[in-house]
Amino acid sequence: MNPLLILAFLGAAVATPTDDDDKIVGGYTCEENSVPYQVSLNAGYHFCGGSLISDQWVVSAAHCYKSRIQVRLGEYNIDVLEGNEQFINSAKVIRHPNYNSWILDNDIMLIKLSSPAVLNARVATISLPRACAAPGTQCLISGWGNTLSSGTNYPELLQCLDAPILTQAQCEASYPGQITENMICAGFLEGGKDSCQGDSGGPVVCNGELQGIVSWGYGCAQKNKPGVYTKVCNFVDWIQSTIAANS
């Protein structure tokens, strides 16, 4: 089933994944400054997450694309100006050339900041993966968004969830015919804990490396429907070559 249709069946206000906020269910409030690579993508409102991979580049999901984005770094309480945030406009927003919005394959994009971020205790980069993460690897998923599987409760403070990478067989069995080689699943087949559309674009970090980008899923924290994430290890060459060509 097409993920766009899945969202429509869920009663989403708009039957596209573009503006879906994250829904971390069964997680916990992150410690302040513990996820310094997490960014908020803003268009007058928070609409997606992302990850800072250098002082001038952010990686997110291609389905979060907007031609102009303000990247907000150093955020913790997203509703309050705490004084340590950096708000930097995008200079370039580059979707993967093979991004498929119908099946959400190659769901990755890069954002070049108009000026370099100042790196400090609240704003730091996350490493790209040196290899793909093995099934069973424990990862940290983070974002701001709905913490309820039904109904809405948008938290002010950044939310975290610890979740394992699932096997590709488990992933494909959960979503028959929908999983490509550029996707991984993470979470709990028994349900109860999940990032539901995740802060679309937000990070999945395993052992200090960015292994996933929140991409799509069916419902939130449902049994046998784990979150689906862009498999970042497949895109390291594209990320590096794109940055080099646009430096």
Swiss-Prot record:
PROSITE patterns: TRYPSIN_DOM, TRYPSIN_HIS, TRYPSIN_SER. Keywords: Calcium, Digestion, Disulfide bond, Hydrolase, Metal-binding, Protease, Secreted, Serine protease, Signal, Zymogen. CDD domains: Tryp_SPc. Binds 1 Ca(2+) ion per subunit. Residues 1-15 form the signal peptide. The keyword Isomerase does not apply. It is found in: Secreted, Extracellular space. InterPro entries: Peptidase_S1_PA, Peptidase_S1_PA_chymotrypsin, Peptidase_S1A, Serine_Proteases_S1, Trypsin_dom, TRYPSIN_HIS, TRYPSIN_SER. It catalyses: Preferential cleavage: Arg-|-Xaa, Lys-|-Xaa. Disulfide bonds join C30-C160, C48-C64, C132-C233, C139-C206, C171-C185, C196-C220. Ca(2+) binds at E75, N77, V80, E85. Coiled coil: none annotated. SMART domains: Tryp_SPc. One of its GO terms (cellular component) is extracellular region. The active site is at H63 (charge relay system), D107 (charge relay system), S200 (charge relay system). GO terms for biological process: collagen catabolic process; digestion; proteolysis. The keyword Cytoplasm does not apply. One of its GO terms (molecular function) is serine-type endopeptidase activity. It holds the Pfam family Trypsin. Its EC number is 3.4.21.4. Residues 24-244 form the Peptidase S1 domain. It is an enzyme of class 3 (hydrolase). Its cofactor is Ca(2+). Belongs to the peptidase S1 family. This is Anionic trypsin. It comes from Canis lupus familiaris.
